[in-house]
Amino acid sequence: MKLTFLGAGAWGTALASHAAAANDVVLWGRDPAQLAAIAATRENAAYLPGVTLSERLAVQADFEQAVAHAADDADGIVVVATPVAGLREMTRRLAARGARPVSMLWLCKGFESGTHLLPHQMVRAELDAAGRTEGFAYGVLTGPSFAREVALGLPCALTVAGNEPSLAERAQAAFHHHAMRIYGSDDLTGVEVGGAVKNVLAIATGASDGLGLGLNARAALVTRGLAEMTRLGLALGGRVETFMGLAGVGDLILTATGDLSRNRKVGQQLAAGQSLEQILAGLGHVAEGVRCAQAVAELASAYGVEMPIARAVCAVLFDGLSAADAVAQLLQRDARDE
């Protein structure tokens, strides 16, 4: 199968390298020098230092040629590997092509800043505006996955959800090999809510661990955080079983407890007294939990959903509340049934 990856960051590169073992894969990025270095050294030194990439992975600096590689093939898939902030631009560029409709997957997790739209809602809006909804297959590949582990060939299980069953089937054919398993879903809303909210909750568990509050506290935050994720997901139209799966509790456990998690690191550094500006300056990579915390809190208010942990994270990030005071406030909440 022909696949094109748009975005040469950690996750796009890792998944492209995995896919190249069984498919005809092209990787595009905004920096031609970075792509040339990947081709010459078989390493993405900026995002996956020390990891050897597949010899079968090809790079292409020309956007149109890269897209045409997969988009002009009947079964091909264009994989958008940008953060949420770049998804509209990529969708717009794909929709503007005069050729046949594109099958596209994205890898990003979060809500759009300002609109609070989920990724599939952003994509649908762009396709509607371009008059290109007919024939476009689109969806998300998501779940508990650290890019470095995938690039190293370690076991991983993900969920693909799309607007057409045929896209999920092709994604399974493309990625379900070696150490990766792909499960299908038709709950686009549910899997995307899980992927967005878990990043915010991971900041909370990171802060708890940074304050030395122990494993009991971590387990409580993960469990009650899952309840918050599920409540918001149901309010937005997701299904409860989705949050019990890979895109819900699975991704939450990994991001909240794994030391490779950028969102968890943000919480740990907030607990150590660093400012958000200092943390983001030193991070070097995207921490989507910071970007979507406000959206989660505002959606909770708009839909009347109780999300005290997510609200506490938002207050620490943007309202000057200390991590220690946020924990104290959560502990002072009235007793209630689970």
From Swiss-Prot:
InterPro entries, per database record: 6-PGluconate_DH-like_C_sf, 6PGD_dom2, G3P_DH_NAD-dep, G3P_DH_NAD-dep_C, G3P_DH_NAD-dep_N, NAD(P)-bd_dom_sf
EC number(s) recorded for this UniProt protein: 1.1.1.94
GO terms for MF: glycerol-3-phosphate dehydrogenase [NAD(P)+] activity; NAD binding
Residues binding NADPH, per UniProt: W11, R30, K109, A147, R262, V286, E288
Binding site for sn-glycerol 3-phosphate: K109, G143, S145, K198, D251, S261, R262, N263
Compartments reported by the entry: Cytoplasm
Signal peptide: none
Pfam families: NAD_Gly3P_dh_C, NAD_Gly3P_dh_N
Enzyme class: oxidoreductase
GO BP annotation list: carbohydrate metabolic process; glycerol-3-phosphate biosynthetic process; glycerol-3-phosphate catabolic process; glycerophospholipid metabolic process; phospholipid biosynthetic process
Transmembrane portions of the chain: none
Alphabetically ordered keywords of this record: Cytoplasm, Lipid biosynthesis, Lipid metabolism, NAD, NADP, Nucleotide-binding, Oxidoreductase, Phospholipid biosynthesis, Phospholipid metabolism
UniProt KW Ribosomal protein keyword: no
Reaction catalyzed: sn-glycerol 3-phosphate + NAD(+) = dihydroxyacetone phosphate + NADH + H(+); sn-glycerol 3-phosphate + NADP(+) = dihydroxyacetone phosphate + NADPH + H(+)
Catalytic residue list: K198
NCBIfam families: PRK00094.1-2, PRK00094.1-4
Similarity comment text for this entry: Belongs to the NAD-dependent glycerol-3-phosphate dehydrogenase family.
Function in brief: Catalyzes the reduction of the glycolytic intermediate dihydroxyacetone phosphate (DHAP) to sn-glycerol 3-phosphate (G3P), the key precursor for phospholipid synthesis.
Annotated HAMAP family: NAD_Glyc3P_dehydrog
Name listed for the protein in its UniProt record: Glycerol-3-phosphate dehydrogenase [NAD(P)+]
Organism: Cupriavidus necator (strain ATCC 17699 / DSM 428 / KCTC 22496 / NCIMB 10442 / H16 / Stanier 337) (Ralstonia eutropha)
